[in-house]
């Protein structure tokens, strides 16, 4: 075509793109006719330079523009590969290049083309020449466009792939609004050698024009689908940064290209047939040539990488470096092409450094490539670095990778707008935001490559593609969770660049925080450890592993670290609790094990703990602020975790003031700084006087003031078994707690009461052992045995029985302190007997049938009954008439059979144990009563060594026989056998004394008269009798106490 020079027309321009092949005369004449018929249109003025033959247009494109139709048109008439004629234009410093894309989609040919072709990429080749009749006189050589892109794998975001080319919004017109309803376009391709000029650009010819893109007309509607909602002005700061750029806004709804001042270069265009484009657009195979590149809207640092022919997926340039390089390029009048994207009022700012491309893996590339055909992406894959320099191609795989990534990071528009705007504004004050996208990370060159799933790719999204993205939204979110590395690499940079990054906040909230341990801080004023009192130097920190207490003693600052595995108990005493202490601050209490004191001493670097006294085990912290319920619950949770780790289950339960005070109440003020500084002044406890402290704690001491005494007790009465019991306890409105009597010991009763001799005194302390779970002491045992034989046993049985004191057997078997005996010739049995010989000076035990000996061994009570000690062998007698019913009842228990009450005695028979069982089973055989000398062992637990006990008793009887009867008699296993009949057993570890008393009581009620073997006593008494025995004994003592009080008062 001929070179013409036309004046600049502000509102009309047209670019005619022709293939680099010979055109027929009819085609040329048609173009000349069109140009001559419309003098206001743009005329091509500069010849196009030759393009490389290896790069071809994939379809013939004819870019036309009319005054009213400012849309893209594609010429389908030329089906052959035609190489167009070069056209050049002269440079003019006063004019800018303007490229207007004429739409022919609304013609029959355009509609047909739109219906026939799928949404694939338009492919441009180096041979394509784009010319404009409105180009100024500047000669632009080698307007390079991007390589041909395979249709299936390309992104939909066409306008997002060329940031250096700015398209003016055409949605303001009716035709533009109709584009939204049409299917979205796929990504266009530009070749490195395609160059484009617009009258909006200045006429300076410096560098090569780049980033031109062919738009597929049946998909170009999406270019402005979002554009109607965005600003139509070019970033003001961008114009300041590019000193030679002349940015101008078209007032009409046409599409404009903003191109930096460049040196005169050839503007070539070429095309191929439309059928070839259609065939390639339907191709499903993924093929990439090294000369192709996909244009992605990225930052200037990425453009510089692309210019240097380095893959974008392998590194990310530094932000500072990028900005510096950008300024340098602008000062050198480097040619830069900006594609204004008319979507969502976003315009590219050349200074934006936060736009990052990422490095996708091969596996991700395969997975994401299926979405590429639905994405429209703008890329500034090429950019000139200095004057006269030409852009170079980049690996097409890099672009394809970038395209695939955008689908993963794509969110809905509301999320994108909300997240992107504050980030962009944080970097560019006063600048308008670019196209909205979700910035996953912000990184720099020095940080190295980042994962593709968090790349910050600015993109367009069609309605149809939006549906696909929404379906994969959950996949994108899960992908973010799998990339903790991204967050780590970018959190530092984003914090430096962005004052607020909601994306990082969202990602950090998604990341699990299971590594964080429970931690609680308290502000405290003082700490008390043994003799030390320290002032606070911070907060006490409590975790599962340690407790850190920073404090100061004199001029020494100490940070005590207590290992929680050595904690025994803890307590939190609020000021409102335990009003007896009158505390104004809460106290945090820790009790550590004694073996940890050495470690505490080492940390304190103090010789105060050299003695390792008991007071050093307690750590008291006086808190400054009241403890909230939330802090209290969190403290219990921490202690529960510690108790699980250390195995101290009691640690999970806090000690109350009443429970913890006995631990340190005996400490003097010299031993414990807490007693000296705190308790003495706050609680008014007399220092060093444990009894007075205890009296103050229990409110037992008399009031020190002159106020009227407020009643702190109440009377309780109880009726049981026809008897009344009276007790005193605290008021119901007071805090109920266990109270141990700490006053003077008071004698309640003497039994038997005077004037009977040998009375036994029972005090209030003895009543405590009658509580459930307590062992009965010897006083209660002796008292009740005396009570039984005096009150419960019959006179006949009393004459035949004798009960030793519970101290008898202990005295008999005790070890002698004096090793030298008066008579060394005495045997061991004689020595033992000598210890208790006075116990029977007024009684002859050999005149008794039953001798009861309470035995206590290893805190276990059981009963030994010496039966018929005066007999040398078993004797069978007739049942006495008076005891026939009792004996028959006993036999029914022994044999588990019933015997008639009117059973008559028969002649005396000497039967063995086996014969006795057979005669018992036969009702017609007459029965005899057996009196057998033996030692019965009635044990409810069978935990004692009964053989030693039996042997000791045999030896005692042998010596006692010699003393009393002055003859020798041997008590052996044959003539004094030991028997252990089956008796009711205890079901706990504390009722052995109760069972002993019940054995004696049952014996007196139902004595054993027939000692024929075997003796069965399993059903001697019901179990419920044992359950009430303690309370019965208590009531008995209180009843006797009241009786004796009345008797003494009268």
Curated annotation (Swiss-Prot):
Entry keyword set: Cytoplasm, Hydrolase, Immunity, Innate immunity, Phosphoprotein, Protease, Thiol protease, Ubl conjugation pathway
Compositionally biased residues, Polar residues: 259-271, 310-320
Basic and acidic residues bias locations: 273-288, 321-331, 338-365, 449-469
UniProt-listed Enzyme Commission number(s): 3.4.22.-
Positions of region (Protease): 760-1050
Biased segments, Low complexity type: 196-211
UniProt key word Transcription: no
Pfam families reported in the protein's UniProt record: Peptidase_C48
GO biological process: antiviral innate immune response; protein desumoylation; proteolysis
Ranges for region Disordered: 1-28, 183-288, 304-365, 443-476
Keyword Hydrolase carried by entry: yes
Function noted in UniProt: Protease that acts as a positive regulator of the cGAS-STING pathway by catalyzing desumoylation of CGAS. Desumoylation of CGAS promotes DNA-binding activity of CGAS, subsequent oligomerization and activation. Deconjugates SUMO2 and SUMO3 from targeted proteins, but not SUMO1. Catalyzes the deconjugation of poly-SUMO2 and poly-SUMO3 chains. Has very low efficiency in processing full-length SUMO proteins to their mature forms.
Name of the protein in question: Sentrin-specific protease 7
Chain's gene name: SENP7
């Amino acid at each position: 075509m001929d070179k013409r020079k036309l004046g600049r027309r502000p509102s009309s321009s047209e670019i005619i793109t022709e293939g680099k092949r010979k055109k027929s005369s009819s085609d040329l004449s048609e173009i000349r006719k069109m140009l001559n018929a419309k003098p206001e249109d743009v005329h091509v003025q500069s010849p196009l330079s030759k393009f490389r033959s290896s790069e071809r247009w994939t379809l013939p494109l004819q870019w036309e523009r009319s005054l009213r139709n400012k849309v893209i048109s594609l010429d389908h008439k030329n089906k052959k590969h035609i190489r167009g004629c070069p056209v050049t234009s002269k440079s003019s410093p006063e004019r800018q290049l303007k490229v207007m894309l004429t739409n022919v989609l609304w013609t029959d040919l355009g509609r047909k083309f739109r219906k026939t072709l799928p949404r694939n990429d338009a492919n441009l080749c180096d041979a394509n020449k784009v010319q404009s009749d409105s180009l100024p006189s500047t000669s632009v050589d080698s307007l390079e466009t991007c390589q041909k892109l395979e249709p299936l794998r390309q992104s939909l975001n066409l306008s997002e792939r060329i940031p250096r080319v700015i398209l003016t919004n055409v949605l303001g017109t009716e035709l533009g609004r109709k584009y939204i309803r049409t299917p979205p376009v796929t990504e266009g391709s530009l070749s490195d050698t395609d160059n484009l000029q617009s009258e909006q650009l200045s006429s300076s010819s410096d560098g090569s024009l780049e980033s031109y893109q062919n738009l597929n007309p049946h998909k170009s509607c999406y270019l402005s689908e979002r554009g109607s909602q965005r600003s139509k002005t070019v970033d003001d700061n961008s114009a300041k940064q590019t000193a030679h750029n002349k940015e101008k806004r078209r007032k009409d709804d046409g599409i404009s290209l903003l191109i930096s001042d460049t040196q005169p270069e050839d503007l070539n265009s070429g095309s191929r047939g439309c059928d070839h484009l259609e065939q390639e657009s339907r191709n499903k195979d993924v093929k990439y040539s090294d000369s192709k590149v996909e244009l992605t809207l990225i930052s200037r640092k990425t453009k510089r990488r692309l210019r240097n022919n380095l893959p974008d997926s392998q590194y990310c340039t530094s932000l500072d470096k990028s900005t510096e390089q950008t300024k340098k390029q602008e000062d050198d009048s480097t040619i830069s092409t900006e594609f204004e994207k008319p979507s969502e009022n976003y315009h590219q700012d050349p200074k934006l450094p936060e736009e990052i491309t990422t490095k996708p893996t091969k596996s991700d590339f395969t997975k994401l490539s299926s979405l590429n055909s639905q994405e429209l992406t703008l890329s500034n894959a090429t950019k000139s670095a200095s004057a006269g320099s030409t852009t170079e191609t980049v690996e097409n795989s890099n672009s394809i990778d970038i395209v695939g990534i955008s689908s993963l990071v794509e969110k809905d528009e509301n999320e994108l707008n909300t997240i992107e705007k504050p980030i962009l504004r944080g970097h560019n004050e006063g600048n308008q935001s670019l196209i909205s996208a979700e910035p996953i990370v912000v990184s720099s060159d020095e940080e190295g490559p980042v994962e593709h799933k968090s790349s910050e790719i600015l993109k367009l999204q069609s309605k149809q593609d939006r549906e696909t993205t929404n379906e994969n939204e959950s996949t994108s979110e899960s992908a973010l969770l799998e990339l903790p590395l991204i967050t780590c690499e970018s959190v530092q940079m984003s914090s430096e660049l962005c004052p607020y990054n909601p994306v990082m906040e969202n990602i950090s909230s998604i990341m699990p925080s299971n590594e964080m341990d429970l931690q609680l801080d308290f502000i405290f004023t003082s700490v008390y450890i043994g003799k030390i009192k320290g002032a606070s130097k911070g907060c006490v920190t409590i975790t599962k592993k340690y407790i850190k207490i920073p404090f100061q003693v004199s001029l020494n600052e100490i940070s005590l670290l207590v290992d929680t595995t050595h904690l025994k108990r803890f307590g939190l005493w609020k000021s409102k609790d335990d009003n007896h202490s009158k505390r104004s601050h809460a106290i945090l209490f820790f009790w550590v094990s004694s073996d940890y004191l050495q470690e505490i001493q080492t940390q304190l670097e103090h010789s105060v703990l050299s003695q390792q006294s008991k007071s050093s085990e307690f750590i008291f912290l006086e808190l400054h602020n009241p403890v909230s319920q939330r802090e209290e619950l969190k403290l219990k949770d921490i202690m529960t975790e510690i108790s699980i780790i250390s195995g101290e289950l009691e640690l999970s339960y806090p000690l109350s003031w009443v429970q913890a005070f006995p631990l340190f109440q005996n400490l003097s003020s010299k031993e414990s700084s807490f007693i000296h500084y705190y308790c003495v002044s706050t609680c008014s406890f007399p220092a060093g006087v444990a009894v007075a402290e205890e009296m103050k704690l229990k409110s037992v001491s008399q009031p020190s003031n002159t106020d009227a005494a407020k009643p702190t007790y109440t009377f309780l009465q109880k009726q049981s078994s026809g008897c009344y019991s009276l007790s005193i306890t605290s008021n119901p409105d007071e805090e109920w707690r266990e109270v141990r009597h700490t006053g003077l010991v008071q004698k309640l009763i003497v039994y038997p009461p005077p004037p009977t001799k040998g009375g036994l005194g029972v005090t209030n302390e003895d009543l405590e052992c009658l509580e459930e779970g307590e062992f009965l002491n010897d006083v209660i045992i002796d008292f009740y045995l005396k009570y039984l034989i005096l009150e419960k046993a019959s006179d006949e049985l009393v004459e035949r029985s004798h009960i030793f004191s519970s101290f008898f057997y202990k005295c008999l078997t005790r070890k002698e302190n004096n090793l030298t005996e008066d008579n060394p010739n005495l045997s061991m049995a004689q020595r033992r007997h000598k210890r208790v010989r006075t116990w029977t000076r007024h009684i002859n035990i050999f005149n008794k049938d039953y001798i009861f000996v309470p035995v206590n061994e290893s805190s276990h009570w059981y009963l030994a009954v010496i039966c018929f000690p005066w007999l040398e062998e078993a004797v069978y007698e007739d049942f006495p008439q008076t005891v026939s019913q009792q004996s028959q009842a006993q036999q029914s228990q022994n044999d588990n059979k019933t015997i008639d009450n009117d059973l008559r005695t028969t002649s005396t028979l000497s039967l063995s144990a086996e014969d006795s069982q057979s005669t018992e089973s036969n009702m017609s055989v007459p029965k005899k009563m057996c009196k057998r000398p033996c030692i019965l062992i009635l044990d409810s637990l069978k935990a004692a060594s009964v053989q030693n006990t039996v042997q000791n008793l045999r030896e005692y009887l042998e010596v006692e026989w010699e003393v009393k009867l002055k003859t020798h008699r041997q008590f052996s296993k044959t003539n004094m056998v030991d028997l252990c009949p089956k008796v009711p057993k205890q079901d706990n570890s504390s009722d052995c004394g109760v069972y002993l008393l019940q054995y004696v009581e049952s014996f007196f009620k139902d004595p054993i008269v027939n000692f024929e073997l075997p003796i069965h006593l399993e059903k001697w008494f019901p179990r419920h009798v044992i359950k009430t025995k303690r309370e019965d004994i208590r009531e008995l003592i209180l009843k006797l106490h009241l009786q004796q009080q009345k008797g003494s008062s009268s």
